[in-house]
Amino acid sequence: MEMQEANQGGGSEVSPNQTIYINNLNEKVKLDELKKSLNAVFSQFGKILEILAFKTFKHKGQAWVVFDNTESASTAIAKMNNFPFYDKEMRIQYAKTKSDVVAKADGTFVPREKRKRHEEKGGGKKKKDQHHDSTQMGMPMNSAYPGVYGAAPPLSQVPYPGGMKPNMPEAPAPPNNILFVQNLPHETTPMVLQMLFCQYQGFKEVRMIEAKPGIAFVEFADEMQSTVAMQGLQGFKIQQNQMLITYAKK
C-alpha cells in the first residue's frame, strides 16, 4: 500500500475516512514492537483491520492504522493527536489514500500491475520492491495476532488457595502510592503502560514481572496522585481487555 508519498507535503484538506496516518514516531523502536504498541493504544477506539509500518528508510517514523469505520478513526485523531508515544508526540491525520484492505471490501481495489499502467512516471524495480516490502510488513491485524491477546479469566473463576470460599473476598489494600493493574493482554509492554500513566502527575515507573504476564505495578509519588490515575484509567481497554486497577499490597 503506497500511502507514504500521499501523506507528505501540502495539498487540499483530506476528507474523513477510516484510515489514519501517523508520523513523528520514534524510529528506534523495532517494527514488531511498534505495531503491537500501536494496536494496544488505538484498539480502544474501535476494531482495527490493519496496521501498516515499514522498515524502508523513507517510511521510518510513520504508520497507518485502518479502522473498520470512519467514526473510530475520527475519535482516535481527536484523542491521540500530539499524545506522547515512545518519548515523541504523535502527529495524526486522515490518510489521503485508501488502504488495500478497505478497497477490496468496497469493491474499488485495483491490482498493483494495472495501476502501474496508468502512472505517469514509471517506478520500475523501485516500486516493485516497495510493494514487496508493503506485502511483507503490512500485515492485517486479524492474521498477525490470532489469539495472542487472550483475556485473563474473570476473578470469579480464579481458584482460591486453601479451600477459601469464593464468597469471602480478600480485603482490599488501603490507599497508597502504588497501583496494581490486572487483566492486561499478555503482550502488553511496560512502554504501553508508561504512555497511559505518564499523563498523570506524580508518575514514577512501571514494573512488570516477566514470569507473570497480565499484571503490572505502577508507582506514583504519593497516594493522592495514584488515586487520580486509578480513577482516570479504571476500565480502560487495551485490546478487548478492561484494566482492573487496585491499590497494591505492601
UniProtKB/Swiss-Prot annotation:
Gene3D superfamilies: 3.30.70.330. Residues 108-139 are annotated as: Disordered. One of its GO terms (molecular function) is RNA binding. The keyword Acyltransferase does not apply. InterPro entries: Nucleotide-bd_a/b_plait_sf (IPR012677), RBD_domain_sf (IPR035979), RRM_dom (IPR000504). One of its GO terms (cellular component) is spliceosomal complex. PROSITE patterns: RRM. Residues 113-129 have a biased composition (Basic residues). Residues 18-97, 177-250 form the RRM domain. GO terms for biological process: mRNA splicing, via spliceosome. It is found in: Nucleus, Nucleolus. Keywords: mRNA processing, mRNA splicing, Nucleus, Repeat, Ribonucleoprotein, RNA-binding, Spliceosome. The keyword Disulfide bond does not apply. Involved in nuclear pre-mRNA splicing. Seems to not be involved in polyadenylation. Component of the spliceosome where it is associated with snRNP U1. Belongs to the RRM U1 A/B'' family. This is U1 small nuclear ribonucleoprotein A.
